[in-house]
Amino acid sequence: MDRIASATFSCPAISLSRVCRISPFGLNIKTNHRKRFSCRVAVASGETSARVVVDNELDLEHKKHDLLRAVQDTQRGLTATSDQRSIIEEALVTVEGFNGGEEIDPVKLDGTWRLQYTSAPDVVVLFEAASRLPFFQVGQVFQKFECRDRSDGGIIRNVVQWSLPSLLEEQEGATLVVTAKFDKVSSRNIYLQFEEISVRNININEQLQALIAPAILPRSFLSLQLLQFIRTFKAQIPVNATSPGRRSVGGLYYLSYLDNNMLLGRSVGGGGVFVFTKSQPLEL
């Protein structure tokens, strides 16, 4: 009996450290469950974020469409009523809110933008003149930015295609270009300094061409030279500062919204608003 007892109590003792290293089966289940639950939460959170981004993008496109629809029947601002201007302003502010405060990307800004609407008096007056004068037409109006490789400024060209139908081709008989350099003064404000006004790309109509060089007669060297001179004619008028040391004529321009296909701007000081859409590159 003593031997049995001795044999029993002489068995090796179980180490406490070994016991502690053994994880209960139930605890492993809970740990794995927590891991799976965390993964599910992360996936669900990612899917929710993606849906929010998509919803925001769709909402933005709808708001941009609403803005373009609001300006559609205003003849680029010429015939806009006070009620229409209020609706347009509200739509403008809504779109501006989608990327308000973001830095302007010069790569996106670079290129040609076609005017869809403006309330700027110095542009609307051109449309008014064209509506009243039968011998004067205003075609497309563009802003052309050259700033891809710069972060502090660049060149901006305001381009107006116009015509005298009795002498020039319809809508695109000639091009008026107002060139300015601009400096970036804040994340969205740029200061324009106008440098030059030019008239170029003169395209006379067929009737005038026939008068200068009739098709039924051999075209003389003089008539051909005259046609070539008209086509390549370019008149330039510099816009200089009124006195040494002062800036040339200019103004502050606030770029209130920019993406790949829409540009919104405001001329600071009550000079009007502008709605542009991206256009094909314009060669000048």
UniProtKB/Swiss-Prot annotation:
Keywords: Chloroplast, Plastid, Transit peptide. Residues 1-40 form a transit peptide. InterPro entries: PAP, PAP/fibrillin_dom. Belongs to the PAP/fibrillin family. Its main location: plastid. It is found in: Plastid, Chloroplast, Plastoglobule. The gene is PAP10. This is Probable plastid-lipid-associated protein 10, chloroplastic. GO terms for cellular component: chloroplast; cytosol; plastoglobule. It comes from the Eukaryota. PANTHER family: PLASTID-LIPID-ASSOCIATED PROTEIN 4, CHLOROPLASTIC-RELATED.
